[in-house]
From Swiss-Prot:
Enzyme Commission no: 5.3.1.1
Annotated compartments: Cytoplasm
Domain of life the protein comes from: Archaea
Species in which this protein is naturally found: Methanosarcina acetivorans (strain ATCC 35395 / DSM 2834 / JCM 12185 / C2A)
Protein name: Triosephosphate isomerase
Main location per the UniProt record: cytoplasm
């Protein structure tokens, strides 16, 4: 994945459900082609196959469990999401928190199935710990700022720069994404200036009246 990398999390917003998931993915694809910036989406689990079947762009799962084939009713199996069309997964989002053991198991399963892993964290120490596990990305998102419209890159820039420094010391191969409150061009520019390689965002684009226009605004200062 190139830098900057934009990962759009649909969460369970109505606008990103069903056919809406496809339409937002099409907007992401169009902006990505126009700009050369890689944009990936994380739709709800049942929509992964729908989006993958209609739009060519990287798709991430919002969650996966560290389980294999067998008696794991209700769990998210890595092989299933990969065959549905996903190329990666979020792990430990603040709205879907896991224990350390579960994070390790999910990451191990992601690697087993060749899925790119984004471990979400909430402060510098947890970011450092996550980097030691060697995911592809860590995404720093203070939970109090998620969905607030107040970007972490402005509200708490030290947590971003501190996370970037901590990860560089532990494993320079792990990339850092900045999340929470990201929605405008100034937010992405600030995140990149603080050393992150991209952003993880959601409502600012998914709930926008015109997601394509919102994405174009997001990347205008890159």
């Amino acid at each position: 994945m190139g830098s900057p990398f934009i990962l759009l999390n649909y969460k369970t917003y109505n606008q990103g459900t069903g056919q809406g998931a496809v339409e937002i993915a099409r907007a992401c694809r169009a902006v990505s082609e126009e700009s050369g910036i890689e944009i990936a989406v994380a739709p709800q689990l049942p929509d992964i196959y729908r989006v993958a079947s209609e739009v060519e762009l990287p798709i991430f799962s919002q969650h996966m469990d560290g389980v294999g084939a067998g008696s794991f009713t209700g769990h998210v199996f890595g092989k299933c999401i990969k065959e549905a069309g996903a190329v990666g997964t979020l792990i430990n989002h603040s709205e879907r928190r896991l224990t350390l053991a579960e994070i390790e198991a999910s990451l191990k399963a992601a690697k087993e199935f060749g899925l790119r892993a984004v471990i979400c964290t909430n402060n510098v120490p947890t970011t450092a710990a996550a980097a030691a596990l060697e995911p592809d990305y860590v995404a720093i998102e203070p939970p109090e700022l998620i969905g607030s419209g107040i970007p972490v890159s402005k509200a708490d820039p030290e947590v971003v720069s501190g996370s970037v420094e901590a990860v560089a010391k532990i494993n320079s191969g792990v990339k850092v994404l900045c999340g929470a409150g990201i929605s405008k061009g100034e937010d992405l520019r600030a995140a990149l200036d603080l050393g992150s390689q991209g952003v993880l965002l959601a409502s600012g684009i998914v709930k926008a009246a015109d997601p394509k226009a919102a994405l174009e605004d997001l990347i205008r200062l890159v």
